[in-house]
C-alpha cells in the first residue's frame, strides 16, 4: 500500500503527504510505521497537493515530522460477533482487559451506511423497566431510542446502571456498553458489577452477555469521537444475526465535545456556542444507524450531559430530535432529596398514547401530570399567602401532589451499597394500581412520609402503620 510522510502535527491532528497518485480516501485508516506501539490515523480531509489531514486515534506524543505512514486502504475495522462478549475493548477493537487477543473471525468497518427505509421496522411493544416514574410517564419501546438528560451530578449514570440491572439482567438478549469520555472509575466499577451479576463470565467468555468498549475522559479526542461508532458496529452485527440487542452509551455529549475539539484543529469555523458546524450531521450519522430492522432490534439507552442545566444548548437540543423517549433529570427534585430525580412534567415518550399503552395507563399518567402541574402553579400562592388561603379543593390537590411526588421515589438495586435500602423492581400493573388509587383519593388518610422510598402501594400502607 501507499506510504507517506508526516509534514505537520497540531495536537490531535496530523498532516501527511502522499504521492499525488496515491492519496488515501476520507475515513481510510493509516498506520504510523515507526511508532513503538500501534498508532492509527483516520483521514478527515484532503487538502490538495497530495496532503491529507487526519485525526490521531491515540496519543500524538512522540510523533515527529518525517515519520513514515502507511495507508491500509480501508476504514478502521473492529472485531464483531460472539468473541467480543465479556471483553473490554478500545476504539480500535483491541483488548484492554489483559486477557489476550479477541480472536474474532469477522471484522466490520466502523463507518457503515444506516439501514435503508425498506429494511427498518417500527415496533410498539413496551419494555418494562421496573422504575415507577419511567414506566408510568415515559414508557420505553422495545427497539426504541431513549435519552437520559441531566446536568452534572443529578444521577444519569446511576439511573443508567439501574436500567442495565433491571433490563439487561432480566432480558435474555445481548448488550453492548460504550463508555464515551466518562470516568474510568465508573467503567471499572461497571465491569466488576457485571462479573458479580454473572453477565460477564471471565472463565468462559462465550457465556457472557455484554461487550464493553471504552474511550474514557483521559483519552485523546480521536478515541472519544469514534468509540461510539465502534460500540454501535458491534451491536449492529448482533442485530443482523436476528437478535434483540441493548446498546448503552454513556455519554453522548462527550461524543459531541470530542467533535468540537477536533473541528477547530481541522480548521472549520465554529458555529453556535463554539460547537462544530457539522454538529447535526455528526449526530445524525450516529443516531440513524441505531435502529431496528426486520431482522432484529437495537434498543438504545443514551445518557446526555446537559451543560449548565440548559436543555436549549445546541448539543442536547440536537439529540432530542432523534429520541423516542426522553427522561429528564431535574436538579430541584434532587435538591429535595427525592430520587430518582426524574421530572414527570418534562419527561416525554412517543409510547404514551392510548393506542399503545391502553386508555387506563394513559389516563392515570395524564392525571398524575395534571395534579403535579396544578401544585406547581399553586406553589407561588402558598409561598406568599400560606396554605390557609387555598380552597378546600386546592388543599386536596396539594396533599395528593405531595404524596405523588414521594411515591415517585424508589430504592434502587445499584444504590443499595450507599443507601442501605434493598432495591425494588415494581411491575407496571402495581405502578398503575398505586397511582390510580392516589388520584381517586383512596389513600388520602395516609401521611405523605409513608410514601417515601417505597415500592408498591402496599409498602406505603405498611410504612403508615409504623409511623
Curated annotation (Swiss-Prot):
Q: What class of enzyme is it?
A: translocase
Its EC number is 7.1.2.2
Q: Does the keyword Acyltransferase apply?
A: no
Which reactions are catalysed by this chain? ATP + H2O + 4 H(+)(in) = ADP + phosphate + 5 H(+)(out)
Give the main location: membrane
Which GO molecular function annotations are given, in alphabetical order? ATP binding; ATP hydrolysis activity; proton-transporting ATP synthase activity, rotational mechanism
Electron transport is among the record's keywords = no
Per its UniProt record, what Pfam families does this chain match? ATP-synt_ab, ATP-synt_ab_N, ATP-synt_VA_C
Compartments, record wording = Cell inner membrane
Q: Matching SMART domains, A to Z?
A: AAA (SM00382)
What Gene Ontology cellular component terms go with this record? plasma membrane; proton-transporting ATP synthase complex
* Topological category with respect to the lipid bilayer: Peripheral membrane protein
Sorted keywords for this record are: ATP synthesis, ATP-binding, Cell inner membrane, Cell membrane, CF(1), Hydrogen ion transport, Ion transport, Membrane, Nucleotide-binding, Translocase, Transport
Residues annotated as binding ATP: 150-157
Q: What InterPro entries would the database entry show?
A: AAA+_ATPase, ATP-synt_VA_C, ATP_synth_F1_bsu, ATPase_a/bsu_AS, ATPase_alpha/beta_chains, ATPase_F1/V1/A1_a/bsu_N, ATPase_F1/V1/A1_a/bsu_N_sf, ATPase_F1/V1/A1_a/bsu_nucl-bd
Return the CDD domains for the record: ATP-synt_F1_beta_C, ATP-synt_F1_beta_N, F1-ATPase_beta_CD
Per the similarity annotation, which family is this? Belongs to the ATPase alpha/beta chains family.
**Assembly information from the UniProt record:** F-type ATPases have 2 components, CF(1) - the catalytic core - and CF(0) - the membrane proton channel. CF(1) has five subunits: alpha(3), beta(3), gamma(1), delta(1), epsilon(1). CF(0) has three main subunits: a(1), b(2) and c(9-12). The alpha and beta chains form an alternating ring which encloses part of the gamma chain. CF(1) is attached to CF(0) by a central stalk formed by the gamma and epsilon chains, while a peripheral stalk is formed by the delta and b chains.
The task this protein performs is described as:
Produces ATP from ADP in the presence of a proton gradient across the membrane. The catalytic sites are hosted primarily by the beta subunits.
Name the chain's protein. ATP synthase subunit beta
Organism whose genome encodes this protein: Vibrio cholerae serotype O1 (strain ATCC 39315 / El Tor Inaba N16961)
Q: What is the lineage of its organism?
A: Bacteria, Pseudomonadati, Pseudomonadota, Gammaproteobacteria, Vibrionales
